[in-house]
Amino acid sequence: MVYFLGIGGIGMSALARYFKANGYEVAGYDRTQSPLTQRLETEGISVHYVDDPAMIPENIDFCVLTPAIPADSKELNYLRDKNVKIVKRAEVLGMLSRQHNSIAIGGTHGKTTTTALVTHILMTAGKKLSAFIGGIARNIDSNVVIGDANDECVVMEADEFDHSFLQLSPYVSVVTSIDADHLDIYGDYQHVVDSFNEFVNKTSDDGLVVYHADLPINTDKKHITYGLENADVIAENICVNQGETCFNIKIAVDDCWEDNNLRYLRDLRELKMSLYGNHNVQNALAAVIVSTYLGVNEADIRRGLATFKGVQRRFDIRVKNTRHIYIDDYAHHPEEIKAALSAARKVFSDKELTVVFQPHLFTRTRDFMDGFAESLSLADRVILLDIYPARELPIDGVTSAALLDKITSKNKMLCSKNELLDIIKGIDPELIMTVGAGDIDRFVPQIEKMLAQ
């Protein structure tokens, strides 16, 4: 029996399903019921929602713990008193990363989409693999691909929170971005950079480090950079045509990496995908490099890009009709919001943009108040919900009202959850985005239903 404390998280639920598929009995606790936990229950995994040691099954082999579980958890302390083996989620992923050639994809932003895209291209090419994705990939309607002992590789999202990705031993490591985030853990930006450098330097000596050319990565490992300029692999001629993003890839260095599959990297023209935004073009560059290194040919790369449907809550177009366009996005950092709103502005340039934002964490809102205000001001209308606290207590002076004061959009307002649907109905928006990492996603089905009519 494998027991999960915090089984409803996107990463924990993937591991729970992996162990269940590999013949283990699985059970777990989470604070609240969600679509993820409901899905686990339909798959035969027992989940309860009360922090009560009496509800823990007997005969547990080990417990998998998420960092989100507080130190005063009754169940956690009960298991410790009983000397049950407790391992962090990252330790389990670390173990799996050592059993197969692992592709670990990290970055403060972009890692989930890139992980899902690499997984999809490899599956398109017929590769045998397992994958652990930090979101629901639309092509497979899942956050996990369950392989077997014959897997050629395992693709995993590498989470920087709580230094989790330092447990991994990748064959290929990818870093999509490094911004100041999780400062409650790291303290400052330099410590974030140091941790990412420690991560890439855990890459095996015969492997590859792939990273965005703008990043302060320092490694002696074999590496390759990508970006829109000043990189080894560059995206050019980016445009949106008939609902698709089109771009070319140019190899900008003479070194053809003759000792490995990177020698097959070449200039590619007229690549197409359904994702929008320059940030997603750059995510695609990383995916193309990784896939080429793992032996995927050009035809399968083109087909994989063209058929990739994206990830839920990542520029997720939920409604597109003659009256309304509704996009849902997980963005919860100023740079992510800037990328998402800029993409919406570019693709739907003739529409007035309304954004509903739920700030996530008091510390993050405090640390990036000015950045949030600047990014949100890209919208014509801003509607702010209260800050979603997650694991935190309130901080004096850190409120949605304080953020609203700094936003320069002429049309802006505060809104309670109870008012949200009526306000959206009254606005009748032509282009609206819901943005945030809290529980704003609970409103998505209702907003979708209202605007789809």
Role assignments for model-derived ranges:
Residues 46-59, 416-424:
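Short acidic low-complexity segments
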Residues 29-30, 48-51, 87-91, 132-134, ...:
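Beta-strand->loop->alpha-helix junctions that form or flank phosphate-binding loops
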Residues 2-7, 435:
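Conserved N-terminal Rossmann-fold NAD(P)-binding element of oxidoreductases
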Residues 24-31, 209-213, 354-357, 380-389:
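Short internal beta-strands
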Residues 11, 15-18, 22, 255-381:
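Nucleotide phosphate-binding/pyrophosphate-handling subdomain across enzymes
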Residues 373-430:
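C-terminal helical cap/extension that packs against the catalytic core
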Residues 21, 29-48, 138-141, 396:
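N-terminal beta-loop-helix "entrance" segment that forms/cooperates
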Residues 18-24, 41, 54-58, 67-222, ...:
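Phosphate-binding loop of NTP-binding sites
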